[in-house]
Amino acid sequence: MLPDRGKQIATEPIEVKQGRLFETEPTFSNRSTKAVTFQGKLTLPVHRWYRLTPSFSPELADDIAGHFKLTRDDFVLDPFSGVGTVPLCMKHRGISACSVEINPYLHFVGTVKTRDYTALDAIESTFKRFIAEYRSSLERVPYESAPGDYLREHAEDIPRINSPERWWSPGNMAQLVSLRRTVMGFVSEPHHMDLVRMAVLGILIPVSNAKHNHVSLTFAKKPLPTVDIAGTLEQQLARMLRDLRAVSNYPAPVINVYLGNSKHLTSVLPEQTKISAVITSPPYPNRFSYARETRPHLFFFDFIDGASAVGQLETDAIGGTWGKATSVLSEGVKPKNELVDGLLAPYLHGINVSGDLMASYIVKYFNDLYDHASEVAKVCKEQARLAYVIGNSKFYEHPLPSDELLASVFGHFGFKLERIDRMRKRQSKTGLYEAVVFMRR
């Protein structure tokens, strides 16, 4: 029972229900938004544990696996793991898979979501013990009457994110600091403890001043009032436990999520890894920053050392454009070879006239993509099938057909284009779409 029935519990405006397996034959043109984007995972068990807006639908990953006629003899790679959508879908199909993720927080998400959990009663007991301990700790926190005093006394426990007061109101931040301290002192089986951390990280944005009103998080004009964070967390833990029970009879193939850079796959994956299918969605060339989007999570449990490390993470990532990466772009970036130069030349002239920074961004993106494609070629079997979900871009009203350019880069490494299906129109600008690029070795 909650201590105060009148206090608000922060929740996402999402219908909570168990998902179903996908029953229709896959089609890839004129798909609904739910069948392409993150919206497709909001009601599916385990997939819904953390919302990342620029992630794609489990239904799409499942449809691609069906289109490829993958069996349990196949081995699937997602080199841009994100929140683990592809490896989790493959797990539920009984197909072994691996994925690679450069962001340490997102690597954690994918790892926790794709693990096997069998001791569900013990997990439930851990959840109950943790909530009880957290509620007990809150009795000593004046988060309604004097949150500022508590925060000053425990300043060393506030996440090291820049301007934390922008992210959380004082009463909510005081509760989160107490929650963070409780997690650090709680003793449990490590994998069960990771589930608790996952639940905590999953509520950071719902109890914050940030909103999912756009592709990137934005701050609300009016800060969120003090809410019942213990109640919000208890709901999240209960939802996660229901999800684990819902998938408890699903197959349990080998799934591995590796921390590393997809531009260096052969250094990240075990030796002799041979992939029969790649299903993935790389960052779109649209200046979206995954490092910026996940800052609260990166800092809350110290997945990253500090602001400079976030800047380096952004610089190393394909499509990095925020923070330190902007300084790199401002110095100018040249095509790394004749292939990239020739592919981009028809598009860069108009963009260069309007802004050198954006031209450098595009060049860096496709330089990075070239390095990535060269590594994919080294780990794929003969006859491997590839599906890359990507959106096109517009820079100063100049279109950039990212799907076609990607196919050309992979063609250089021996991957034949089968077809490009443009799945849906995007709503942010006229002329934008999302496509899936099918290729075969």
Predicted regions, residues:
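S-adenosyl-L-methionine
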Residues: 1-72
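Acceptor-substrate binding/catalytic loop of class I
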Residues: 48-52, 159-167, 294, 356-367, ...
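Conserved S-adenosyl-L-methionine
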Residues: 57, 64-138, 232-267, 271-320, ...
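Short glycine-centered segments of the SAM/dcSAM-binding site in methyltransferase folds
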Residues: 75, 195, 384-385
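Class I S-adenosyl-L-methionine-dependent methyltransferase module
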Residues: 96-99, 103-249, 291-355
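C-terminal target-recognition/interaction regions appended to catalytic cores
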Residues: 199, 203, 394-396, 426
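A short glycine-rich, Lys/Arg-flanked "PGG" loop and its adjoining helix->strand segment in the class I
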Residues: 367-382, 410
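Core SAM-dependent methyltransferase catalytic element
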Residues: 381, 429-441
